[in-house]
């Protein structure tokens, strides 16, 4: 409670110094008497009959009497403005203000202090929350940087592996292409050899057929009737022997 009062007391003092002059100024005060007060309010100036050569002395005495009368009127006015009723009115005004301040201190200090304390706690909590978020963000940022560095390393490793794999695939493709070319060449050579053999065989067959035809023609051309009879007899003899 004392801490709450200490927190609120400066604000109350500010309010006190702010409203006290207003309370004092609100007390009714009679208007000051004008400088040129009526002649009946001032003590009569003593008129001194004197000859013409005493005019200066008479003017000085008249001015002194005027100033003295004005001073007496002002003193009387101040005494009248600070009468008992006005002092009591001022007293009750100040007392009312003091009671109001006491009520504010009694019933308003704790809520105000609680509000200020709650606000302070909320601000502190928000600051702590922001600080925690900042720490988490920095941690995540460092983790992201580490991951990014690892990703760059992984990318370099993947590129190197891809290049090496591409070289291996290139070598395999060239090897398969060379093997395919060799197989094609071998197949072509074999096909050529087969065609040559077939051609030779065909030529031999054609030549044999042609030779047989030519031999048949020659035999028929030079075969006589006796030769034909002899051939038939020989054939029948062979058939009979079988």
UniProtKB/Swiss-Prot annotation:
It is a multi-pass membrane protein. HAMAP family: ATP_synth_b_bprime. F(1)F(0) ATP synthase produces ATP from ADP in the presence of a proton or sodium gradient. F-type ATPases consist of two structural domains, F(1) containing the extramembraneous catalytic core and F(0) containing the membrane proton channel, linked together by a central stalk and a peripheral stalk. During catalysis, ATP synthesis in the catalytic domain of F(1) is coupled via a rotary mechanism of the central stalk subunits to proton translocation. Component of the F(0) channel, it forms part of the peripheral stalk, linking F(1) to F(0). It holds the Pfam family ATP-synt_B. This is ATP synthase subunit b. F-type ATPases have 2 components, F(1) - the catalytic core - and F(0) - the membrane proton channel. F(1) has five subunits: alpha(3), beta(3), gamma(1), delta(1), epsilon(1). F(0) has three main subunits: a(1), b(2) and c(10-14). The alpha and beta chains form an alternating ring which encloses part of the gamma chain. F(1) is attached to F(0) by a central stalk formed by the gamma and epsilon chains, while a peripheral stalk is formed by the delta and b chains. It is found in: Cell inner membrane. One of its GO terms (molecular function) is proton-transporting ATP synthase activity, rotational mechanism. The lineage of its organism: Bacteria, Pseudomonadati, Thermodesulfobacteriota, Desulfobulbia, Desulfobulbales. InterPro entries: ATP_synth_b/b'su_bac/chlpt (IPR002146). GO terms for cellular component: plasma membrane; proton-transporting ATP synthase complex. The chain crosses the membrane at residues 8-28, 87-107. Keywords: ATP synthesis, Cell inner membrane, Cell membrane, CF(0), Hydrogen ion transport, Ion transport, Membrane, Transmembrane, Transmembrane helix, Transport. Belongs to the ATPase B chain family. It comes from Desulfotalea psychrophila (strain LSv54 / DSM 12343).
